[in-house]
Design a protein with these regions (language model features):
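Membrane-interface extramembranous regions at the lipid-water interface
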Residues: 2-63, 122-143
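Hydrophobic alpha-helical transmembrane segments in multi-pass membrane proteins
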Residues: 29-46, 60-120
């Protein structure tokens, strides 16, 4: 069983907790988001005692999974719509509109996912535990 050490940083008077990986827990929590599911899984398996790091690792895996499923669903919908609506010249205009809307939805999902990813890394580094609606519920079940 790994022991956690509490050190007081004299400059900021903040207690730092070292995780089982040898990193401060806030650094380990932030790094668990770095490569999504992969780093989330690594930190989730390494950290057995530190609930802060385990939650961020689990939420990283869940968030990555939810975003991945959303991309796959959007790709399937786009492929089906393109196949159906571009099959004849009478639906070409509607197909073009639907294609543009799906492209905008994909762009919003990509930029939104990136913004949430950066937000989660920053907040974990600050020692906070933001809860993303679907991902946090899944993370709680994994804990």
């Amino acid at each position: 069983m790994a022991s956690t050490t509490h050190e007081i940083d004299e400059e900021s008077a903040v207690a730092t907790v070292e995780s089982e990986s040898g990193l401060d827990e806030n650094v380990a929590g932030a790094l668990s988001y770095l490569f999504g599911f992969v780093t989330g899984l690594i930190f989730f398996l390494i950290e057995k005692e530190n609930d802060f790091v385990r939650f961020h690792a689990a939420q990283s895996m869940a968030f990555s999974g939810v975003v991945f499923v959303a991309y796959i669903a959007l790709s399937i919908v786009g492929t089906v719509m393109t196949t159906v609506l571009f099959s004849s010249t009478s639906t070409f205009f509607v197909g073009s509109i639907v294609s543009m809307v799906l492209g905008l939805v994909w762009l919003v999902l990509a930029l939104g996912g990136f913004a949430v990813w950066i937000y989660l890394m920053i907040r974990a580094y600050q020692g906070k535990t933001p809860r993303i609606p679907i991902a946090a519920g899944i993370a709680d079940k994994l804990m």
